[in-house]
Amino acid sequence: MFTVTPAKIYLNQEKTPVSEQFNDVYFSNQDGLAESEYVFQQGNHLWERWIVYQEKHFVIAETGFGTGLNFLAVTSLFRQFRQQYSHSPLKHLFFISFEKYPLPKVQLQQIHQFYPQFSALSQQLCDYCLEAIQGCQRFHFAETTLDLWFGDIVDNLPQLGDYMQNRIDAWFLDGFSPSKNPQMWNDELYQQMFYYSKPQGTFSTFTAASAVRKGLVSAGFEVQKRKGYGKKRECLCGIKNAIPQQNTKAPWYLSQPASLLSEDIAIIGGGIASLFTALSLLKRGAKITLYCEDEQLALNASGNKQGAFYPQLSDDDDRNIRFYVHAFFYALQQLQWAIKQGIEFEHEFCGVALCAYDHKSAVKLAKISSYQWSKSLYQNLNKEQLSEKIGLPLDCAGGFIPQGGWLAPRQFVQNTFSYLQQLGLEIKTSQKITALDYRNLQWVLTNEQNETFNHQVVVLANGYQITDFVQTAKLPLYPVRGQVSQIPTSANLLKLKSVLCYDGYLTPADKMKQSHCLGASHIRNNKDRHFSHQEQRENQQKIQQNLASTDTDKNMDWLQDIDISANIARIGVRCSVRDRVPIMGNVPHFEQQCLDYRNIFNLRRRKQPIPDAAQWKNLYLIGALGSRGLTSAALLGETLASLIYAEPLPLSEDILHNLSPNRSWIRKLLKGTEIK
């Protein structure tokens, strides 16, 4: 359901990889690299177009990633272009590629050995965690961003969605021979290529098959034949000579990029959502000012001493599972980046154990196991195996997430913000912004002292206080109080090797081997931050009751070492929403959407025109991360930065709809229910 089938290949006598699934070569026996350069780079006139290109980024989409040779070659070419034309407005290349049967990393490395000129790029690609999971995975290179979509292109290409209409500059129409892969080469593919292509967008392909040519012409492309590569007589290339048209399938969820003139952006917040949004925007060259109401950063929900880090692998909505899995791997990527930059923070990728401590949790974990995740993501273990993983005896089976673990959120957030200040981030603490007003193409921010600050774009990332403004007051967000207990370690508890999850969690000892974090209470609509003796006791009771053993031979004495008597705890107030899914994107204009969509149920039924969603111009938000901010914030911040800059988004359209800030209103309106 979520994993995809890996490729099965062999090398023929010419050392060319051959697919067993399609019984076809991945590229020419003659010279795969020369073929790639001739067919795709020259066929799309890339170098000539880049020289005169006036936008900040260029987008290439490829219909078959295969060995990654086209990606390596064009990334290398773009690097040469940036070195030769360093003052060009074109700064970045986006490469979107689809792959139904991904090659295992070992085989990629084996094939790339024949192209030593790409050794550094290949190493960087293979260093990333290329998990064969359905959907998009984003990987960063110096001047190039790779969005690699695993799964059938028939399913994934439509998930680029309405947002990507008229945004792709060039297509590498690649894949196995049309006669051997007819499921991909069809009219629907060509129509979607046309839909996503910019006016004057191009395509090129190695084939000259009549059915392909006719399909591309029928879709709207002007198609030309050119000399084929090597022994091939002809191949095709073409252009979209058409006026851009807007044909939106779900206008009520359509995201809108910012109108960027000066790239001057304000972020209101001070936690992990603000951090990753600032990081992604700074990498794009934005001028960022952060406004935090506290004297220090990370004093609220992002301020715990230790926090568990792992994906949510079970949910009634599969969109949420796909989102959290991709968010988890992207967060791992960003944490590794931080470590390489020398940013110090306590962490341990020691794995996370999920306990089947009662019937409900056992059913939940059985469902997770049924998805057949790779063992690098999830392992189903009996009680002996799970006990071995955590280093302490357990009387229950469960699951294990090997790449999960814990990190110190407050330390990570504060130290990474300090690093971002070196990149140009301006931080204003003790600045509570009380009002937002849009006038003269700028947002005017007013603080408690009635001082004002002007910025072109504003991002709200201030947790449950997002709703403090007139523009956001109707969003259905609420505060959730959480008390995390800090307990001393013991000879027994020092043996804990992995994060332990039940109806709560217990972390291994911190780096000083002095204490553990035991969490956490969950009190809705409560933003009180005073210590609670009751919640402290409940944190203790949950672990002792959930994991208590009925087996008298089982030595569970370590549970008695859970000592809360020192009454040390930290209280944070998280932000959540009823469906417990984050919100990210444009801030919706509530009153205007109520007016525009009051009759949307009948408009859809009659197939009448429906306007795009009314939104506050250049105002965005990221919030409701709940207790999973360590996992979700990095990908949400990256997606929001991409949206602001009108770049491709690293999430499928169905997930983006599920993250939309107006989703609760729209769901009611689409059913014919009035909202107030």
From Swiss-Prot:
Keywords: Cytoplasm, FAD, Flavoprotein, Methyltransferase, Multifunctional enzyme, Oxidoreductase, S-adenosyl-L-methionine, Transferase, tRNA processing. Its cofactor is FAD. Pfam families: DAO (PF01266), Methyltransf_30 (PF05430). One of its GO terms (cellular component) is cytoplasm. InterPro entries: FAD-dep_OxRdtase, FAD/NAD-bd_sf, MnmC-like_methylTransf, SAM-dependent_MTases_sf, tRNA_MAMT_biosynth_bifunc_MnmC, tRNA_MNMC2, tRNA_S-uridine_synth_MnmC_C. It catalyses: 5-aminomethyl-2-thiouridine(34) in tRNA + S-adenosyl-L-methionine = 5-methylaminomethyl-2-thiouridine(34) in tRNA + S-adenosyl-L-homocysteine + H(+). Residues 268-676 are annotated as: FAD-dependent cmnm(5)s(2)U34 oxidoreductase. GO terms for molecular function: flavin adenine dinucleotide binding; oxidoreductase activity, acting on the CH-NH group of donors; tRNA (5-methylaminomethyl-2-thiouridylate)(34)-methyltransferase activity. Catalyzes the last two steps in the biosynthesis of 5-methylaminomethyl-2-thiouridine (mnm(5)s(2)U) at the wobble position (U34) in tRNA. Catalyzes the FAD-dependent demodification of cmnm(5)s(2)U34 to nm(5)s(2)U34, followed by the transfer of a methyl group from S-adenosyl-L-methionine to nm(5)s(2)U34, to form mnm(5)s(2)U34. This is tRNA 5-methylaminomethyl-2-thiouridine biosynthesis bifunctional protein MnmC. It comes from Histophilus somni (strain 2336) (Haemophilus somnus).
